[in-house]
Amino acid sequence: MDHAVSSLQYFFLILLCLSLLVCSNSDDGSKSRTKTILINFGDSNSDTGGVLAGSGLPIGLPHGITFFHRGTGRLGDGRLIVDFFCEHLKMTYLSPYLDSLSPNFKRGVNFAVSGATALPVFSFPLAVQIRQFVHFKNRSQELISSGRRDLIDDNGFKNALYMIDIGQNDLLLALYDSNLTYTSVVEKIPTMLAEIKKAIQTVYLYGGRN
């Protein structure tokens, strides 16, 4: 049991450290002459409309009622943490990667989809979001070489701020849908972290450094 508790504490310590790192990087980016580009992966904590575009599920009021005053695809009544990052960086809110209607990808892109998991048990798990990122980067480079100027270039991908906020749904599924013991749930955490590690390694392989 002590080992299980220490593993769970270690998991949340990693999440805290990553959050602090993102905050630090976002402050530096706001002072830089180069406009910060933000690329996000995750679940409902940072989904700005991915599940709406991807599934067609109607997500209307009361979602969005206190700030946007309309449904935006966010599963909440106002802004998300990623929205506050965008405001701090003086940039528009991130467009979902899956949104085909007038998206704006010049300052970033959001691959997050509500319900997403670190492990491959959902239609848009982290591994799929990473593959979408690879396609997005390759396609952006193709279009830029053809004359497009409204997309992220190679230098932009290199210097972009990358965020990954995922894992809560894995724990919820394990705790409430699988009838696992607490110890068994905690034992799944290293596998979840391995998926996040692979995602970070792929982002690095394709030029991401922050």
Could you describe each region identified by the protein language model?
Residues 2-210:
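Conserved active-site regions of diverse hydrolases
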